[in-house]
Amino acid sequence: MTSTPKPLVLIILDGFGHSESPEYNAIFAANTPVYDRLRATQPHGLISGSGMDVGLPDGQMGNSEVGHMNLGAGRVVYQDFTRVTKAIRDGEFFENPVLTGAVDKAASAGKAVHILGLLSDGGVHSHQDHLIAMAELAAQRGAEKIYLHAFLDGRDTPPRSAQSSIELLDATFAKLGKGRIASLIGRYYAMDRDNRWDRVSAAYNLIVDSAAEYTADSALAGLQAAYAREENDEFVKATRIGEAVKVEDGDAVIFMNFRADRARELSRAFVEPDFNEFPRARLPKLAAYIGLTQYSAKIPAPAAFAPSSLDNVLGEYLAKNGKTQLRIAETEKYAHVTFFFSGGREEPFEGEERILIPSPKVATYDLQPEMNAPEVTDRIVEAIEQQRFDVIVVNYANGDMVGHTGVFEAAVKAVEALDSCVGRIVEALGKVGGEALITADHGNVEQMEDECTGQAHTAHTSEPVPFIYVGKRKVTVREGGVLADVAPTMLKLLGLEKPAEMTGTSILVDA
């Protein structure tokens, strides 16, 4: 193939899964003339974005980080969740030199080990089993002061589901005969990723100085008091549990989230000497600050599980073959369409340009369900018309970010906004003879109520995701595709042989 249609646009509809059930399905309820027309007239099917198909444990729902890694890598990427869980099972976790070194340094001086992390069985940013293993490791190595600073979920889990996790950790500490939960705060504060530093400062001050709006005798009592204030898990305000615990000089702090994007801001507050995003009342001289994984090459903190390198991911391979590419998203998903899609690489490849559209500054995205998708689309249409790029990769955050709010009516509006944006891209491509692949990284917005509890469903799902080809070729969509097959499909459309490292295979078959 000597020339290929230009550009090829990969449209990633974040959190946009496929469910046969119409119940509380925002996609089913929305008015989507473009999506309906494409499914009626273009080759389409479903591909898997969860579990073993994306390198997660069997049955585990997909997520944005994992989805974009697989989409860009063209192979199944075994995730940090899986790596850490396996290390715990095999016993290697308890011999990890980064973790044991940090604990030993603090314990030998009679200092405390502070464990930070999302206390959840959601498996998206963390897993409570990993926090339990860390408490066990600290106790085994002689630490007497072990404190868990628990961030509550309610986003990748039901909105009020923290009680069982707290009970599990309380039981763990009782069994160990040492350690306790020292503080509670919702992930809304501790795990911001959009430079809302007022939220992060609340978490930092709680952990470091035990500065809290509320106090409680036990973690369960603190949780029940938050529920009485109408705060779901995600939004629980800073709560000190029992006697005040401060992070002192010589203590070790270990952040047990395995996913990077929502661990960066709080980590920066602990380790950056010239940090100026908010005034730190105190910066303890720690024996160690450890991340379970590498949160960023720019954050000076050792990682217990260092990143494994991925060679010949789509972006790198396009650059090697002289192709130009554009990556575009709004703030909430910018890291996904750049860092994660590039296999954990921060810098652009040669011939790669990036456009970041700031996400709207609203408390929660149900207040502006269209987010800034129209502005993202303006820039894509402009790039298509200019025909400067061979490949454009775009992420639309709406399905996921509005899906996470649990507000059904807002989710319907988000889907309708997406439909309009996709229509504009398809129209622009038609004028220049370009092509598109439309897919998603995981499900979310197609299930907005938990059938078992009747609560709002704010988490991701394990549903398959759509895959639609937009263009003039005579092709069909094969069954059994996974996210790792998308990059090889794109290379086929571009007339490029896939590299040996890509084990995925094209989803499109010549008709």
From Swiss-Prot:
Q: Give the residues annotated as active site.
A: S64
Which GO biological process categories is it annotated with?
A: glucose catabolic process; glycolytic process
How and how many cofactors are bound, per the record note? Binds 2 manganese ions per subunit.
* Pfam families registered for this protein in UniProt: iPGM_N, Metalloenzyme
Gene Ontology CC annotations of this record:
cytosol
Q: Look up the EC number in the record and give it.
A: 5.4.2.12
Q: Which residues bind substrate?
A: H125, R155, D156, R187, R193, R259, A260, D261, R262, K333
Q: Where does Mn(2+) 2 bind?
A: D14, S64, D441, H442
Please state the span of the N-terminal signal peptide per the UniProt entry.
none
Q: Which reaction does it catalyse?
A: (2R)-2-phosphoglycerate = (2R)-3-phosphoglycerate
Alphabetically, the GO molecular function entries are: manganese ion binding; phosphoglycerate mutase activity
Required cofactor(s): Mn(2+)
Involved pathway(s): Carbohydrate degradation; glycolysis; pyruvate from D-glyceraldehyde 3-phosphate: step 3/5
Per UniProt, the keywords (alphabetical) are: Glycolysis, Isomerase, Manganese, Metal-binding
Sites where the protein binds Mn(2+) 1: D400, H404, H460
Supply the InterPro entries for this chain: Alkaline_phosphatase_core_sf, BPG-indep_PGM_N, Metalloenzyme, PGAM_B_sf, Pgm_bpd_ind
Tell me which family the UniProt entry assigns to this protein: Belongs to the BPG-independent phosphoglycerate mutase family.
> What PANTHER family has UniProt attached to this entry?
2,3-BISPHOSPHOGLYCERATE-INDEPENDENT PHOSPHOGLYCERATE MUTASE
Described purpose of this protein according to its UniProt entry: Catalyzes the interconversion of 2-phosphoglycerate and 3-phosphoglycerate.
- Subunit architecture: Monomer.
Q: Write the protein's name.
A: 2,3-bisphosphoglycerate-independent phosphoglycerate mutase
This protein's gene is called: gpmI
